[in-house]
Swiss-Prot record:
Organism encoding this protein: Mus musculus (Mouse)
InterPro entries linked: TMEM255
Family statement: Belongs to the TMEM255 family.
Biological process according to GO: response to bacterium
Region spans: Disordered: 302-331
Membrane spanning stretches: 30-50, 57-77, 89-109, 226-246
Record's keyword terms, sorted: Membrane, Transmembrane, Transmembrane helix
Name of the molecule in the record: Transmembrane protein 255A
Pfam name, any one: FAM70
GO cellular component, one term: membrane
Domain of life: Eukaryota
Cell compartments where the protein resides: Membrane
Membrane topology, as annotated: Multi-pass membrane protein
Amino acid sequence: MHQSLTQQRSSDMSLPDSMGAFNRRKRNSIYVTVTLLIVSMLILTVGLAATTRTQNVTVGGYYPGVILGFGSFLGIIGSNLIENKRQMLVASIVFISFGVIAAFCCAIVDGVFAARHIDLKPLYANRCHYVPKTSQREAEEVITSSSKITPSTRALRNLTQAVKEVNCPQLSRGLCTPRIRGNTCFCCDLYNCGNRVEITGGYYEYIDVSSCQDIIHLYHLLWSATILNIVGLFLGIITAAVLGGFKDMNPTLPALNCSVENAHPTVSYYARPQVASYNTYYHSPPHLPPYSAYDFQHSGVFPSSPPSGLSDEQEPQSPSPSPSYMWSSSAPPRYSPPYYPPFEKPPPYSP
């Protein structure tokens, strides 16, 4: 009995605990997916800014931002569903897993490129030159003087590009005159007279920039994208783990055991007293005395004889019954109606 009551109490207490655990898991899953969505938007923004900063450097890792953003969006929707929650969360976990792999790869690529292929020492020393875009007439003069013939078809296609010659003094090879286009930041310290095998410092020109300060911005954007991809990597792993634990939880109500009665019933002192209905008195069996009036009236017909072996002297003198305890002879006998259970036919009348 005590064990049954303990089980009932535990089942009663499991209802708020289960609902509280479900709401807590739901709140945590929404928090991590919203945080991952914000980080993925930052990865996408910074990656696109780094990719479109120059024309010849396109290594900004914005692909993980797209994949992680879509996966976190599915996770937010699935966390607020009841019927199709599992399917949406499984799809979210799959996209987040691919986004984690992409973030790992892009973090390595962006970090290695920013560390080994961009040298900011010539930029900080003001040894890089920015070549603005020239007019069409100046470009024709440069091409004509360099080729010493009339402009060809190939030269005419390049008229829209600003072409200039920059003198880069080199101690080992003499004077180099590379030709560069307009809107380009060119660093002579990183250029070895066209010998790409002996390049000492990575990229020496950055095309389609507004100034050489854009290279510094590109360097910072690449490192920012690398850090954000690392953050997205770990946050994606945590989000996938949280969603994986929440996808199988449902707000189901536990079964309550109502077969065991309460051992200590509560008594309400302000409750209205119950009044028995007419049917209760009608169907209840009448309370009859153990003897009827007929027994009292005819008790003198058969007088009790004294037991054998006792003389008149040894017979105990019983006190005479008081008239108050005896039925009077003039009183009518009490009538007790026979009791018949409900739905039972009474016996036939007999005179």
